[in-house]
Amino acid sequence: MTRLPYYEIHSFADPDVPFSGNPAGVCVMDAFPDDTVLAGIANSNNLSETAFVVARGKDQWNLRWFTPAVEVDLCGHATFAAGAVLLETGAVRGDTAHFQTRSGPLSVSRSAAGFTMDLPQVGLQAGKPDTATRNALGLSGHELDAVFDIERIHGARYQMWVLADEDTVRDVRPDLGQLRTIGKNVIITAPGDAVDFVSRFFAPASGVDEDPVTGSAHCSLAPYWADRLGEARLTARQIGPRPGRLEVEPAAGRVTFHGHAPRYLDGAIILPDA
């Protein structure tokens, strides 16, 4: 049997809200096995994302991400979780874990209040609100500020829908079957009541009905709201059934994330010998 160190981290947890943040699995390996093994582990974990990390040099790691259904090109909260694990367990000797990924070099560092992470911004283009998506989101008759198309980063179409207020975002009850049929992942967002902005993220096209706190979504949200509000550093909350809180700073084509990453469990995944 093979034992693989395994951790579950609640990325971007709100310190004031128990059981908040986005759960991510982190599996530390000597080498990547066959992709079917990685996919099987992620499917068995049944978390929105599982991160797999393999050492490649001093404080340097290869990193891959899998949902229960597919491998993805970028996952912010699982990157945040992987960095937290490596820094807290002493696997990283310095203060920063450096990753090589499908989306290029990424990093997670210690900070006074938790951890910071650096990800690339993901661009927006003006889009149009189509009837099928509007109906799937249950937004017929609701005011829309804007709709944007987002670069494909999970192998699926992405859109960001900007709504009027926080209550509208909180009250959305999407028809996930319709969104899955459309083949579209959707971020909904609005100005926040007690923070700069709020959001939710539905990703049935990538095998995740609703992701609790989504780093990659904030790669588009952060520059949009920074430009709209004229702020350099913003506080954000994702307000689905399992909320989370983070701070974001977009600059020079990147987004710096600040947040907490408490460890929920650690142990081992036990695989039978081939």
Regions found by a protein language model. Name each.
Residues 1-74, 80-274:
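Active-site proximal loop and beta-alpha junction motif in alpha/beta enzyme cores
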